[in-house]
């Protein structure tokens, strides 16, 4: 598909995807910024989903590496969640390919308000680490279930995935915000690539647009990861509230 984007619009996209990477690495929810930006630039919904996954996957790779390097994750839990999210996201992306543009837009309109309520309800998350460091069958199944559910959401919708992962890992598994964010990075990395492989096989990624945006997203993720790792909860909590405001703002805009 021949998609032409002007130089000023391309500059706008590069800036917005960089900012999205910054937000995503700190608290999740970068898709709340990048998805509307791609749509605003004129990409059809399916191409928007695919190209956004490409840039997001590139950025999340570097963010995950930063958290791993700093030991800010429970690798066993993260890998189990990643296995679930890979399967869920692949299924979600295949479902998206079967839907029309109109249905996709309606789905976003229905699901995002629910996402807003969940984030608002759980905005004051505990930051103490209540995990005892062991991994039994119950925890393993819970990690797989978290990954499967959030991966399915990420493959079908996307925005807020990282935030939901933080909520799940703190509320259900007792991790502190920093470790929950790291676990979420592994989960999100797997779900991003599962969806991306599906979109690549369908030829939906617009590389002339996606490559510059991917580079910008990588830079944003590296900077955001640094702040999240050094500042911890003092930085992550406010960023999660910023994500909430962006989500609610998008809902209001969609209703106008």
Q: For each predicted feature, which ranges?
A:
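Residues within membrane-spanning alpha-helices of integral membrane proteins
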Residues: 10, 53, 108-112, 116, ...
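Residue-level signature of the transmembrane alpha-helical core
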Residues: 14, 18, 22, 53, ...
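Selective hydrophobic functional segments
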Residues: 50-103, 107-110, 192-242
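Hydrophobic alpha-helical transmembrane segments in multi-pass integral membrane proteins
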Residues: 147-157, 195-203, 210, 247-256
């Amino acid at each position: 598909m021949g998609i032409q984007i002007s130089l000023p619009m391309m500059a706008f996209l590069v800036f917005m995807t960089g900012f999205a990477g910054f937000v995503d690495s700190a608290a999740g929810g970068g898709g709340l910024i990048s998805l509307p930006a791609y749509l605003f630039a004129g990409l059809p919904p399916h191409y928007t989903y695919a190209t956004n996954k490409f840039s997001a996957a590139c950025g999340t790779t570097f963010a995950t590496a930063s958290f791993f390097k700093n030991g800010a994750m429970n690798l066993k839990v993260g890998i189990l969640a990643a296995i679930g999210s890979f399967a869920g996201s692949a299924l979600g992306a295949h479902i998206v390919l079967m839907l029309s543009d109109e249905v996709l837009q309606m789905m976003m309109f229905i699901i995002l308000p629910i996402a807003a309520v969940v984030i608002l309800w759980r905005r004051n998350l505990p930051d103490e680490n209540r995990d005892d460091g062991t991994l039994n069958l119950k925890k393993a199944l819970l990690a797989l279930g978290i990954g499967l559910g959030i991966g399915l959401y990420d493959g079908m919708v996307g925005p807020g995935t990282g935030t939901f992962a933080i909520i799940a890992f703190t509320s259900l598994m007792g991790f502190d915000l920093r470790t929950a964010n790291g676990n979420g990075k592994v989960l999100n990395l797997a779900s991003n690539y599962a969806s991306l492989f599906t979109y690549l096989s369908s030829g939906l990624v617009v590389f002339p647009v996606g490559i510059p945006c991917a580079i910008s997203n990588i830079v944003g993720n590296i900077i955001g990861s640094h702040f999240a790792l050094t500042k911890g909860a003092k930085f992550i909590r406010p960023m999660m509230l910023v994500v909430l405001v962006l989500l609610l703002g998008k809902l209001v805009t969609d209703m106008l």
